[in-house]
From Swiss-Prot:
Cellular component GO terms held in the UniProt record: cytoplasm
UniProt KW Zinc keyword: no
Protein name according to UniProt: Aspartate--tRNA(Asp/Asn) ligase
Segments of this protein annotated with the region Aspartate: 199-202
Amino acid sequence: MHRYRSHTCAALRKTDVGSNVRLSGWVHRVRDHGGILFIDLRDHYGITQIVADPDSPAFKVAETVRGEWVIRVDGEVKARADDAVNTNLPTGEVEIFATEIEVLSPAKELPLPVFGEPDYPEDIRLKYRFLDLRRETLHKNIMSRTKIIAAMRRRMTEIGFNEFSTPILTASSPEGARDFLVPSRIHPGKFYALPQAPQQYKQLLMVAGFDRYFQIAPCFRDEDPRADRLPGEFYQLDLEMSFVTQEEVWETMEPVMRGIFEEFAEGKPVTKVFRRIAYDDAIRTYGSDKPDLRNPIEMQAVTDHFAGSGFKVFANMIANDAKVEVWAIPAKTGGSRAFCDRMNSWAQSEGQPGLGYIFWRKEGDKLEGAGPIAKNIGEERTEAIRKQMGLEDGDACFFVAGLPSKFYKFAGDARTRAGEELNLVDRDRFELAWIIDFPFYEWDEDNKKIDFAHNPFSLPQGGMDALENMDPLEIKAYQYDLVCNGFEIASGSIRNQLPEVMVKAFEKVGLSQQDVEERFGGLYRAFQYGAPPHGGMAAGIDRVIMLLVGAKNLREISLFPMNQQALDLLMGAPSEVSPAQLRDLHVRLAPVQKS
């Protein structure tokens, strides 16, 4: 017999009754029933019940074992009595009568339990992550992660993509975040960088003629902590294709992403055909470029109904600035003063002066609008708003006014808040859509200059003609995101593969041809030797998994994550290094300036 086991703790069934077996695993719990000891033995695969009665030669050792000790058990498989069958376990019809127990490794008293869903501080859980990972939910999440990534690989290979690994030590390049830098010992004063993404390498693979590339790519960004991203590193399904339009990228990847969701959604409906929503429409309709389309609320502009009206706050704003707009946020079933007051209080807690509203109710046979706004704009305008928004008795509508670029995020948050409070959001489905036609440039208010809105390597719609003749802030990019349930889960673009167009695009943000050659020399040179039209995307694996398993944050689907302060509490990173190591790297530490 094998030294440690003949079966796993999930393998035994009623057909094994009478067999002598050997199992090894962790003591999940021990129960004493009238002098008979029952041990739930757990391994990676499942749980089997072990029985040790006082007549068993294993009983003496069984009395000593405690939770999370690692033991080996020899014994005979017996059928449980009918009233003792555990239908919650695959092994629930049998139990092992122990003849020998060997303690392979005792365990100290645990700093946190490894069963159930303990409400322990996250830093304790991360410090003892090897224990936390024994919990059933977290263990299951990690195994789901493995299966989802394997399915991604399988699906990409099936449609003709080749997996290539790109370098981890590379050159620093500005891609929207700080680089993690690695000092070179061999080249004093110079640094490598960990890749924020394999962007340039995958484009170089297209120039090299490989046609279809993908990899499960680690990406490293030295960003301030964010709720929707793990500090330090994350993984993406990275891909690139030659001789494609953006339509062909969508047509290729939509079945892959839909298939992944359908395979792991556990029966929840998944969008069959992904909608394509222009960025400008997404902002105006949902107040977000990653809208949760499970929320049926769609905003509309109602500026004309307030122009010249008796509601002077809005009317004066409209009269004084032609760019001012009023947006309406319809709230089906929200037509109670209590709900409207709650929304108004929430808006004030968000730093807003308030949130104007109208709600409709039947007065006899007549449907009337109520609230200060309805009173000020009059019955005719109130009715026109109701008809435009498709509202009825018991419904409400909220209003925001000003410059859309200033208020759209708040309007989107109000839409989300109303949808959640009124239970309008169907949480048991996955709603996916493409957001397309992103702006190529944006105004950087901090530095008072034009900057790239997204990927600087994207192709501007209209090419060189647009760059030379259009207002930069009006230029759109062949840039697209895939969104699901309020999260951006993928982003991509058709690339700018002509060197002269690339240089012109960077000139608009203040970089010269020399700057381009210095910062992106490899890519710039490659484009001068025959570069095919190409494009691709990258899907955030961590976010996809988080959505599919229903985890509340990204740390619940990652093996050994850092905490929100970018500290690895298990391994003690980042840590100080010895003076000798610093000398080898030609690095001298400057005193930390106290703020």
